[in-house]
Regions:
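Hydrophobic anchor residue at the start of the ABC signature
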Residues: 168
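Helix-to-loop junction immediately C-terminal to a conserved catalytic motif
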Residues: 77
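The feature captures the beta-strand-to-loop junction immediately N-terminal to the Walker
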Residues: 62-64
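Short coil-to-helix segment of the ABC ATPase nucleotide-binding domain corresponding to the Q-loop/switch region
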Residues: 114-122
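Conserved ABC ATPase "signature" region
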Residues: 125, 132-150, 202
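Conserved ABC transporter NBD signature motif
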Residues: 85-97
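Conserved signature/switch motifs of ABC ATPase nucleotide-binding domains
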Residues: 153-156, 174
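Signature (C-motif/LSGGQ) region and adjacent switch/coupling loops
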Residues: 42, 97, 117, 143, ...
């Protein structure tokens, strides 16, 4: 820990400039994140994390609890700052929250006093944008998410899965370049989660947004991802990146028994078990 306490933080601006030349939509280079305990002892959460995601790619991030997955997502979202290294989105340094990044959390976090339509258009109103300019695309997202006819319903009138679909549409309402998802289906039962995986795949195939999804489910990661990134226990590092060669659209009943799925699941499990 003494090394962490005396670590020299490199200049983020210079690093970000190098990232902009790589061609990835979003990239992290040399990311270090340090937290302090109540007693002031430094805790190394992320250590020299390098990660790149191409435009339109769906990447799933898996790792043991406490390895820094959510911390990395917060850094990608501009909700926190790294102690070393840099992030780049579409060639520009990430130095704070941006309309170019949509975020979906484990809980839908819908405002209960607003209707579905009011919830999904909230980012537009808060950001000072004209709803009229985005109304047609947002209504198309509602159609893709199978929420047509529910625009005037309130969150309490929706199932958990429907609430998460509303949260996804809300995150996409400002047409972000990047969608970050932190265990969005972790609180759902197994069958609903499987259905939501299929729904998310359908929405993604229609929108082709760049997605980074955090999950503890190996099956979910393989079903949804073009690539699965495996992290180590804390301090979080990238252990391996595995390409998923399964054809799309994927159907759970067919995919889970596919030899490629079985092989990848076995390999990911071995990496997680150390």
């Amino acid at each position: 820990m003494a090394v962490v306490a005396t670590m020299t933080v490199p200049g983020n601006a210079a690093t970000a400039g190098a990232l902009a030349r790589t061609g990835a939509l979003i990239e992290a280079k040399g990311i270090v994140k340090i937290y302090s305990t109540v007693s002031g002892e430094p805790v190394l959460a992320l250590d020299q994390v390098d990660m790149a995601v191409a435009d339109g790619e769906f990447v799933c991030l898996v790792g043991p609890s406490g390895c820094g997955k959510s911390t990395l997502m917060r850094l990608f979202a501009g909700l926190d700052r790294a102690d070393a290294g840099a992030f780049s989105l579409a060639g520009a340094a990430i130095d704070g929250p941006s309309a170019e990044v949509g975020v979906v959390f484990q809980q839908a976090t819908l405002l209960p006093w607003l209707t579905v339509w009011q919830n999904v258009t909230l980012p537009l109103r808060v950001g000072g944008h004209s709803i009229g300019d985005r109304e047609a695309p947002v209504r198309e997202l509602i159609r893709i998410a199978a929420l047509q006819g529910f625009e005037n319903k309130y969150p309490y009138e929706l199932s958990g899965g429907m609430q998460q679909r509303v949260a996804i549409v809300r995150a996409l309402s400002r047409d972000p370049k990047l969608l970050l998802m932190d265990e969005p289906f972790g609180a759902l039962d197994a069958l609903t989660r499987e259905k939501m995986n299929a729904e998310l795949q359908r929405i993604w195939l229609a929108s082709r947004k760049t997605v980074v999804l955090i999950t503890h489910s190996i099956d979910e990661a393989i079903f949804l991802g073009d690539r699965v990134v495996v992290m180590s226990p804390r301090p979080g590092r990238i252990v391996r990146e595995l390409k998923v060669e399964l054809p799309r659209p994927r159907v759970a009943a067919e995919t889970f028994g596919h030899p490629e799925h079985v092989k990848l699941a076995r390999e990911i499990r071995a990496l997680l078990e150390g």
